[in-house]
Swiss-Prot record:
Keywords: ATP-binding, Cell cycle, Cell division, Cell shape, Cell wall biogenesis/degradation, Cytoplasm, Ligase, Nucleotide-binding, Peptidoglycan synthesis
Protein's organism: Pelodictyon phaeoclathratiforme (strain DSM 5477 / BU-1)
Pathway it works in: Cell wall biogenesis; peptidoglycan biosynthesis
Predominant location category: cytoplasm
Residues where ATP binds: G114, T115, H116, G117, K118, T119, T120
Pfam entry (one): Mur_ligase_C
NCBIfam families attached to this UniProt entry: murC
Catalytic reaction(s) noted: UDP-N-acetyl-alpha-D-muramate + L-alanine + ATP = UDP-N-acetyl-alpha-D-muramoyl-L-alanine + ADP + phosphate + H(+)
Official protein name in the record: UDP-N-acetylmuramate--L-alanine ligase
């Protein structure tokens, strides 16, 4: 892969999921990569192992010698000292999505978009193509167990990209196949209204060339509404609504899911996934539909889906003692994702008490969706709400908005056992008492709640967890 005379790329915010994937792809393609981030961890350490030079913190001198500087939408360009220094030095400064568009230019692009499920669907498609010997290039905004990372540099013609709608980033991509996996209100700080978000998805779909294909999930009402505006060939998929590709005979059993597919009049049985939940059946249908469009034999697609083994922080089991005590970590941060994750836990582990531990992400999202979070979490047997992870926002701009807003919404939705615990140490102390057989401790959120999940899993792994019994902690059975 070549980008003219560009040889050295500096990435601001390199530890982020989407940015680290670009860094990894550039490294594997022979570029010199430097990057900076306010914090270090597993992701930045892995990049360093691949040859990247990683700086902790932002300093002007770190962009010296770079041919281009790349940054994500999460970075405020006017406030970042490295971006300011690059512009003063005449070094081109571009956003992540523009770099992605350049990397895709001469490939057969498969772009997966949607307010939910795009990371998993992208990884499923990647797994299927690799298992079908297509050797794709892949960029995912998360770590795939199968890929052992977020990026693959393949020799084949396909480039599989997770397409992010935040800041309209996906409109810079050039898909030949565009998957629209889901659509509802999200990222209102970018779009302002749901109608504006819908128009962006229409524009994304219409970037497909006349010989390409748009693949749409018709179980989502907002997708059905915008399909008439998509001036391209479409394949539809779903479970509840009539579609070209549909799933039936769905069986959810712990970590495994089985179902059958009817596609364009043909039936395919014994489809098996190593991940739980109806939402993952929809993700698999999106992947299967994509594979059919590429002309891959259905039998190979089904075998590839069976090899998909999950994503880091997508219902990731961090501890399981085999006697009913589990610690699960999930990235769910939108009410619909929280609902799907709790539902997967309740339907797959019917004999377990589900102890949901939720960290809200963003003050604006908490304020906008408090009622919906309450309803989604109320289906768990016990709910702990942590304080809000602010990310790019400041609490002073949102007076009166904290985790108690969601805890109160859970109570109003019928949740009988819910607590707001702002301090992480106090929350850890409370969760130790729940580390008994028969309980699934289900951590959800896009912030640093994952560190608490790891800490609780380590506590359980050290053998401190006690045997559950009729009188243990909760005093009630799983509902």
């Amino acid at each position: 892969m070549e980008l003219g005379k560009t040889k050295s790329v500096h990435i601001v915010g390199v530890g982020g999921a989407g940015m680290s994937a670009i860094a990894e792809l550039l490294l594997k393609s022979g570029f010199r990569v430097t990057g900076s981030d306010l914090s270090s961890g597993e992701v930045t350490e892995k990049l360093a192992e691949h040859g990247a030079i990683i700086y902790k913190g932002h300093r002007a001198e770190q962009v010296a010698g770079s041919d281009v500087v790349v940054y994500s939408s999460a970075i405020r360009a006017e406030d970042n000292i490295e971006l300011i220094a690059a512009e003063k030095a005449g070094i081109p400064v571009i956003k992540r999505d523009e770099m992605l568009g350049e990397l895709m230019r001469y490939t057969y692009g498969i772009c997966i978009a949607g307010t939910h499920g795009k990371t998993t669907t992208t990884a499923m498609i990647a797994t299927m193509l690799i298992e079908s010997d297509e050797s794709p290039t892949v960029m995912i905004g998360g770590i795939s167990d199968y890929l052992k990372g977020s990026t693959v540099v393949g020799e084949g013609k396909y480039m599989v990209i997770e397409a992010d709608e935040y800041d309209r980033a996906f409109l810079k991509l050039t898909p030949t196949i565009a998957v629209v996996n889901s659509l509802e209100s999200e990222h209102m700080d970018t779009y302002g209204t749901l109608d504006e978000l819908k128009e962006a998805f229409v524009a994304f779909a219409n970037k497909v060339p006349f010989y390409g294909r748009v693949i749409c999930c018709v179980d989502w009402p907002e997708i059905r509404k915008i399909m008439p505006k998509m001036n391209r060939l479409c394949t539809t998929f779903g479970i509840d609504e009539p579609a070209d590709v549909m799933a039936f005979d769905i069986v959810l059993d712990n970590q495994h899911t089985t179902f059958s597919i009817k596609a364009f009049g043909q039936e395919y049985r014994d489809v098996s996934l190593q991940v739980p939940g109806r939402h993952n059946v929809l993700n698999a249908l999106a992947a299967f539909s994509t594979g059919l469009e590429l002309g891959i034999l259905p039998e190979r697609l089904i075998a590839g889906l069976g090899r998909y083994s999950g994503m880091r922080r997508r219902f990731q089991v961090k501890y399981d003692n085999g006697h009913g005590l589990m610690v699960v970590d999930d990235y769910a941060h939108h009410p619909t994702e929280v609902k799907a994750t709790v539902r997967a836990a309740k339907s797959g582990w019917r004999d377990s008490r589900i102890v949901a531990v939720f960290q809200p992400h963003l003050f604006s999202r908490t304020r906008e969706f408090a009622h919906e979070y309450g309803w989604a979490l109320s289906h768990a047997d016990m709910v702990y709400v942590a304080d809000i992870y602010p990310a790019r926002e400041k609490g002073v701009d949102y007076p009166g908005v904290d985790g108690e807003l969601i805890a109160d919404a859970v109570r109003k939705a019928g949740g009988k056992h819910v607590e707001f615990v702002a301090d992480m140490q106090n929350l850890f102390t409370a969760l130790k008492e729940w580390s008994v057989n028969g309980n699934m401790l289900l951590f959800m959120g896009a912030g640093d709640i994952t560190h608490l999940a790891t800490r609780v899993a380590n506590f359980c792994r050290e053998g401190v967890a006690v045997q559950g019994n009729e009188d243990s902690q909760s005093g009630f059975a799983a509902s």
